[in-house]
């Protein structure tokens, strides 16, 4: 079977377009089109190599189990969900904070997926008070035109007495003015607000010298999920992705190598699972430890 035929069959089976293949090759769509038809007049050998590599890579992907992170009910995630639920029911501002990679985002996304009256904003370092208002307007189906006061008033009018919940992930990225904007919306509209982020979120809410009393005094509950997850949580998450993690030695190796971090655990599980699928060897504690040596974080 020619490489062109193999590539055509792969594209048909996977539903890949010539544009997608061209992007993977780093070539133009015209080159891929001509190559597939056997009409390419350039360096056919170099395109053959690209095709071979692409086909082999796709074959490796097919061998590998598709492992994706998903929400798993654990002791920590249940605590987080309860703090969110209380903010929703009581119209309070609650906070969830802790180290990166412990599942805060997953908890918020799960709550949003289960409650259609919950709004989720995922902030980044470029977020200003105006960006927060524009994002909220987008979620509420409101116009993003107008000055900040007009946008704020529009959001308050849409949310007042609605019983809705506003959640902001990575809220440590928000400057003081953005946090104050959220406080004002909470006060005026009477909705619950959940802020989730790294530990410095608490400092941002209090102020370095405790000068933001008006803001921090609004916080009802603040859940600190710490620097790492307990072994039971790591075990539950690991087994949900990799049945071999039920073996005591493999489970123990994953916990130790993950440092109690769910994000690092996912990288470990994906790596050892892929190696197992491709090599044909069973997942072992030794394989976990060996792969862990290659992880930077």
Where are the language model's segments positioned?
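Conserved adenine-nucleotide phosphate-binding loops and their immediately adjacent elements
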Residues: 60-73
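Sensor-1/coupling segment of RecA-like P-loop NTPase cores
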Residues: 95-100, 185-213
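Walker A/P-loop nucleotide-binding motif
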Residues: 88-110, 124-125
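Conserved AAA+ ATPase "SRH/arginine-finger" region at the nucleotide-binding site
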Residues: 121-125, 204-209, 220-232
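Pre-Walker A adenine-sensing motif
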Residues: 71-88
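Mid-core helix/loop region of P-loop NTP-binding domains shared across ATPases and GTPases
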Residues: 128-129, 134, 143-187, 192, ...
């Amino acid at each position: 079977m020619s490489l062109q035929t193999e590539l055509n069959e792969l594209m048909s089976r996977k539903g890949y377009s010539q544009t997608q293949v061209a992007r993977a090759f780093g070539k133009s769509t015209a080159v891929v089109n001509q190559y597939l038809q056997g009409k390419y007049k350039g360096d056919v050998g170099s395109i053959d190599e690209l095709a071979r590599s692409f086909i082999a890579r796709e074959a490796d992907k097919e061998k590998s189990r598709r492992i994706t992170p998903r929400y798993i009910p654990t002791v920590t995630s249940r605590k987080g969900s309860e703090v969110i639920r209380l903010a929703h029911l009581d119209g309070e501002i609650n906070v969830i904070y802790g180290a990166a990679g412990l599942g805060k985002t997953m908890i918020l996304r799960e709550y949003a997926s289960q409650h259609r009256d919950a709004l989720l904003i995922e902030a980044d370092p470029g977020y200003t008070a105006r960006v927060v208002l524009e994002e909220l307007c987008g979620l509420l189906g409101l116009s993003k035109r107008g000055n900040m006061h007009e946008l704020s008033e529009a959001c308050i009018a849409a949310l007042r007495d609605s019983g809705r919940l506003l959640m902001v992930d990575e809220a440590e990225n928000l400057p003081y003015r953005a946090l104050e904007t959220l406080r004002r919306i909470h006060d005026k509209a009477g909705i619950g607000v959940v802020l989730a982020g790294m530990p410095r979120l608490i400092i941002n809410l209090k102020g370095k010298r405790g000068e933001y009393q008006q803001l921090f005094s609004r916080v009802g509950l603040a859940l600190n999920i710490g620097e790492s997850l307990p072994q039971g949580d790591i075990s539950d998450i690991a087994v949900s992705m990799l049945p071999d993690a039920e073996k005591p030695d493999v489970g123990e190796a994953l916990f130790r190598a993950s440092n109690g971090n769910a994000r690092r655990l996912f990288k470990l599980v994906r790596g050892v699972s892929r190696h197992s699928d491709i090599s044909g060897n069973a997942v072992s504690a030794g394989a976990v430890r060996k792969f862990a040596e290659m992880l930077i974080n």
